[in-house]
Amino acid sequence: KVEAIIREEMDGLGAQEILMSSLQPKENWLQTNRWDAMDVLFKIPSQTKKEYALGPTHEEIVTPLVKAFVSSYKSLPVAVYQIQTKFRDELRAKSGVLRGREFVMKDLYSFHLTQADLELFYQKAMQTYLQVFARCGLQTKVVEASGGAFTKKFSHEFQVLTDAGEDKILTSPSWMYGQNSEVATLEEGDACPDHPEEKLEWRKGVEVGNIFDLGSKFAEAFDLAVTNEAGERQPVLMGCYGIGVSRLVGTIVEACHDERGIIWPKNVAPYQVELISLRSKDEAMQARISEVALGLYEDLMKQGIEVLWDDRANASPGEKFADADLIGLPLRLVVSEKMLKENSVEWKERVKLEAQMVKLEDVVEMVGEFVSS
């Protein structure tokens, strides 16, 4: 579901989805002088004595790829993206999917004739990223950071404030921006630039995305140039834009939980509804519970509503409720002997403490409204 949101937003940005090789020739990395410069590069020897890198990023592949298709300024701008497994030889792989040596990433690359066009796309990409994260139920800060191995310019990170984070971010509660500790020019206790009544403070954050203005660095390495309107050859300008997809899922959990378990935002919940049927010692009542639960399940599924049905016969009500809170789907419906005597089901939203009774004949319509709201 996270990937579907990303694809929607990338397509809306005018980017085309492709899929590139994870195995990358050493020669490409030598051309950009990054074979020895990037310390997280997995290097793989082949039986033919050739060396390859397991892709941590794809500038070395996408640049010569675009070169094969673009020769005129009339073909620009171009934007391509992929969602693919990446590999980085992290010294401190930890925290599950938040920092691993193998992870899923969406990487977008844009190619432009002029700096003005690149900057325009860069700003559009920034707004699109904010939209992606908002749709995933997250509040993010746009944070100035170092360009690292990608560029000497500053980059922008998208940080989610959580104690599970490794990055130090200087920001304030109402400020949508911030500065990474690597490049901070402001200090703790300074007045917030946009909200002077608030003081800046250091917070921990998880980086869920980043965007870079690459300039002509990679284009020059691969001689990616086009003939401009004046008939002159000029290097193409590039931007790259990443979202850690698997890290994003882990960050949603870190940001959206309580002591009982996960609280999935509606847009990315694995299912929209958890249906629980409780056992009855009375045979006729048990048959009625099963009949009503099955009917509800089928009616909701027909409406396109995703339902996880806990019909385990060997689990107690307490176990089922605890597991429902742990899994954290947005809505829990309970069919039980007590409820059916009232011709009702129990309705409990994961974000609320209190449950309520809803008449059987109203349930499907109410669930539809809840899911779409």
Predicted regions and their residues:
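NTP/phosphate- and nucleic-acid-binding module
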Residues: 1-373
